[in-house]
């Protein structure tokens, strides 16, 4: 871990870490580059937060925090390695992020992944922010849970087309149109008595 800290310091990152209660083990590490911090201060309105679970060599969750500029370009704000995927760990990470803002305004919109602990931590640290679910995660759930409801490939494809139109609607009228169209075409479950 000391090698990581030395490397972060060498390339100019600001970083924080916390250890276990007995001080024998590093639990969580948060790091932010000064240039990312400057962008974050200029564009604090939208946060995208994703935790990649155990995809690295050491099987440690990596939290990525991304910002969005006024021209819709994304930029990396910060990263954190956390020992557990619990609200306490995510809260600590988000508190470090908030601390890095000093007195700059807080995010208005946060798009977390669907992890309940992360969503609760966001609500704790940034209570005034609005939340939106990530389209990619919603789409994955549709593929996972809805496909079996459609008896034919044609009906499934029609649903996916209508779903795409719904989520890409640019007006309330279009949204309501596609919403009602999807509702009217959804398979109905028969009432059991």
Where are these regions (language model features)?
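Eukaryotic short linear interaction motifs
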Residues: 39, 55-57, 71-75, 89-90, ...
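A short, conserved beta-strand element enriched in hydrophobic/aromatic residues
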Residues: 65, 75-82
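Conserved, non-catalytic sequence blocks in retroelement Pol enzymes and Pol-derived host proteins
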Residues: 52-55, 81-87, 111, 148-150, ...
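Extended amphipathic alpha-helical interaction segments
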Residues: 1, 6-11, 15, 98-101, ...
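Active-site beta-loop-alpha junctions of metal-dependent nucleic acid enzymes
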Residues: 56-58, 79-103
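Short, conserved catalytic/metal-binding motifs centered on acidic residues
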Residues: 49-53, 74, 110-113, 137
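Structured beta-rich ligand-binding regulatory domains in large eukaryotic signaling proteins
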Residues: 70-73, 86-87, 113, 126
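Structured nucleic-acid-interacting core domains from mobile-element enzymes and related host factors
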Residues: 1-63, 68-70
């Amino acid at each position: 871990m000391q090698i990581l800290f030395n490397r972060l310091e060498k390339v100019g990152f600001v970083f924080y870490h916390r250890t276990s209660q007995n001080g024998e083990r590093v639990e969580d590490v948060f790091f932010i580059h000064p240039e990312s911090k400057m962008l974050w201060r200029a564009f604090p309105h939208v946060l995208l937060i994703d935790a990649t679970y155990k995809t690295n060599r050491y099987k440690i969750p990596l939290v990525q925090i991304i910002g969005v500029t006024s021209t819709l370009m994304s930029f990396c704000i910060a990263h954190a390695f956390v020992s557990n995927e619990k609200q306490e760990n995510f809260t600590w990470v988000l508190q470090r992020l908030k601390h890095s803002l000093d007195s700059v305004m807080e995010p208005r919109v946060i798009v977390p992944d669907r992890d309940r602990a992360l969503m609760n931590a966001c609500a704790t640290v940034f209570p005034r922010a609005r939340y939106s679910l990530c389209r990619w995660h919603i789409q994955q759930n549709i593929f996972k849970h809805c496909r079996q409801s459609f008896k034919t490939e044609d009906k499934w494809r029609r649903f996916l087309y209508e779903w795409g139109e719904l989520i890409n609607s640019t007006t309330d009228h279009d949204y309501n149109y596609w919403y009602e169209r999807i509702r009217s075409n959804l398979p109905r479950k028969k009432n059991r008595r």
